[in-house]
Structures are given as structure tokens and as C-alpha cells.
Amino acid sequence: MRIGHGFDVHAFGGEGPIIIGGVRIPYEKGLLAHSDGDVVLHALTDALLGAAALGDIGKLFPDTDPAFKGADSRELLREAWRRIQAKGYALGNVDVTIIAQAPRMLPHIPQMRVFIAEDLGCHMDDVNVKATTTEKLGFTGRGEGIACEAVALLIKATK
């Protein structure tokens, strides 16, 4: 078994909506990013890549490459997952924590879990997503951006 950890953060800027966990969420602000700014899928992709010792999302999909400008993070996750499976790994489970004062994430979490399970070809019971605030402390608490942490457990499927 191998464990990976991922973290991502994006500042608010411009106009919304935002995309979090593959879900389009109405919000007056957008997120500043080279791709679609999906902190959940970026952190999750990093956690999975880390567990497989395949580097990180920036190595695989560099923000200096125009090909990834505005990229759909679900596509990036699926490509990373293909590479991980090619190394002989299967998914144990993933656990994601969104850190944001606003917008409210709870109504969108069930759909995030559906999308992640679809993209990883796993059961929804293998995907947990939760959200918290920082009680108005720090940059997320001041509403300056959104952060996310993710943990992934991989199991060696083949020798």
C-alpha cells in the first residue's frame, strides 16, 4: 500500500462561476488559474501521483505549456489515473478536505463524489469529500481564495 498527499490553493479573481470537484458552482468571483482552477481535482491528482511516485500535477501538466491553458481538470485527473494504473496500482480510497469560507460547498459534495468516482472508475464508497472553514482566519477565512488537501491510498494490483 502507498499513501499520497496533495494540496492546492487558488486565489479569487475575476468573475465566477467556479469549478470545484468537477462541479460548476455559481459564485460572484472566479478563481485565478492556468487551467480551470479546480482545487479539489488538483489536490487529488497530486495525492494520487505522489502515492505512485510519479511526481506532481505541475510536472505532468506544466502551467508553462499553452496546451493546458483552461484545461478541464477532470481530463487531467483521468490522464494521471491512466498512468498510475499503467504502473500496476489500484485505488484503495481517497479523502478530500475543501477549505473555504465561501461559497458553501455542502450542497455540491454529492455530485463531486459522483464525478471523482466516475473519473477513477471506483465505487462512491471509496471517495470522501468534506468541507470546512477556518473560522474567518487566514486567506481562506478572509474570502481571498480556496484551498484543498487530499489523501490517496493506492494498492499494488500487479507485480
Swiss-Prot record:
Q: Which GO terms describe its molecular function?
A: 2-C-methyl-D-erythritol 2,4-cyclodiphosphate synthase activity; metal ion binding
| Residues that coordinate or bind 4-CDP-2-C-methyl-D-erythritol 2-phosphate | 8-10, 34-35, 56-58, 61-65, 100-106, 132-135, 139, 142
- Reactions catalysed according to its record: 4-CDP-2-C-methyl-D-erythritol 2-phosphate = 2-C-methyl-D-erythritol 2,4-cyclic diphosphate + CMP
The Swiss-Prot or TrEMBL record describes its family as follows: Belongs to the IspF family.
Its biological purpose: Involved in the biosynthesis of isopentenyl diphosphate (IPP) and dimethylallyl diphosphate (DMAPP), two major building blocks of isoprenoid compounds. Catalyzes the conversion of 4-diphosphocytidyl-2-C-methyl-D-erythritol 2-phosphate (CDP-ME2P) to 2-C-methyl-D-erythritol 2,4-cyclodiphosphate (ME-CPP) with a corresponding release of cytidine 5-monophosphate (CMP).
Q: What do we know about how this protein assembles, alone or with others?
A: Homotrimer.
The name under which this protein is listed is 2-C-methyl-D-erythritol 2,4-cyclodiphosphate synthase
Q: To which species is this protein native?
A: Escherichia coli O6:K15:H31 (strain 536 / UPEC)
